[in-house]
C-alpha cells in the first residue's frame, strides 16, 4: 500500500514542476504521461484524484476529466441513457456495445473534453479509464486528442500496464499499441 502512496506523492510533485508543465525532456514528443497502477489499488487512486482535484495549493491548474462520467454525459445529450438497459436486455450486451460504439466515438469525447482558452500551467488529468471500458479505449482517444491539446500536458491515470509501446488495461486484456506517451513514474 505504501508503494502506491509514494508513487502518487511523486505524481503530485511532478505535475507542478515547470519541466513537466512545459513538456521539457520529451525530445519534442507530445506531453502525454501515463500513471500505471495495479487495478486493486483503484480506491486509493480515486481518493488521490479527489484530493488533487480539491487541492487549492497546487502550482498548476488541474482539469480533471472522468471518462466514464463524460460517456454518461454524452449518452444523456443523445437522450439514450434510459433506453440502454432495455436495449441490452432485448438485444444482448454485444449488440448494445456495437450500437454505442457506432454512435459514440472519439469526436464526441473530444467535444466534451475540449476547452478554451488553454492557459500556461494547465494539466489535463484523464481518469475513469477502467470504468469506461469497453465503451472507449484510451489508446484511440489519446491519438485523437493530440491535435487539440498539443500545448497542455495530459496525465492518464491507468489501471494496468504501459511498457512504452503497448497499453494493457487491467494487466489482462490484449495489449494495444500506443507509443506516443511516457510512463510518468516507474
PLM regions and their residue ranges:
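Extended, basic/helix-rich recognition subdomains
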Residues: 30-33, 37, 41-44, 48, ...
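N-terminal, charge-rich interaction modules
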Residues: 3-81
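Glycine-rich, aromatic-bearing surface loops/beta-hairpins
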Residues: 137-186
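Long, charge-dense
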Residues: 62-110
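A short, acidic, amphipathic alpha-helical segment used as a generic capping/interface helix at domain edges
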Residues: 17, 105-117, 138
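Conserved P-loop NTPase "ATPase switch" module shared by AAA+ and STAND
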Residues: 119-135
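Flexible, charged surface loops at secondary-structure boundaries
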Residues: 25-29, 115-121, 149
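Short acidic, S/G/P-rich loop/turn micro-motifs used as interaction or catalytic elements
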Residues: 39-44, 70-71, 99-106, 130-134, ...
Amino acid at each position: 500500500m505504501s508503494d502506491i502512496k509514494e508513487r502518487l506523492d511523486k505524481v503530485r510533485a511532478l505535475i507542478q514542476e515547470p519541466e513537466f508543465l512545459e513538456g521539457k525532456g520529451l525530445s519534442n514528443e507530445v506531453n502525454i504521461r501515463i500513471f500505471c497502477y495495479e487495478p486493486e489499488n483503484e480506491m486509493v487512486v480515486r481518493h488521490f484524484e479527489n484530493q488533487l482535484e480539491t487541492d487549492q495549493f497546487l502550482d498548476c491548474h488541474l482539469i480533471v476529466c472522468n471518462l466514464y462520467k463524460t460517456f454518461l454525459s454524452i449518452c444523456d445529450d443523445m437522450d439514450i441513457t434510459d433506453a440502454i438497459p432495455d436495449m441490452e436486455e432485448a438485444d444482448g450486451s454485444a449488440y448494445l456495445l456495437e450500437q454505442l460504439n457506432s454512435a459514440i466515438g472519439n469526436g464526441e469525447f473530444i467535444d466534451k473534453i475540449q476547452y478554451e482558452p488553454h492557459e500556461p500551467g494547465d494539466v489535463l488529468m484523464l481518469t475513469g479509464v477502467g470504468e469506461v471500458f469497453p465503451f472507449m479505449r484510451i489508446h484511440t482517444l489519446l491519438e485523437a486528442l493530440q491535435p487539440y491539446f498539443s500545448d497542455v500536458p495530459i496525465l492518464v491515470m491507468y489501471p494496468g500496464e504501459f511498457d512504452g509501446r503497448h497499453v494493457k488495461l487491467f494487466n489482462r486484456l490484449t495489449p494495444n499499441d500506443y507509443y506516443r506517451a511516457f510512463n510518468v513514474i516507474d
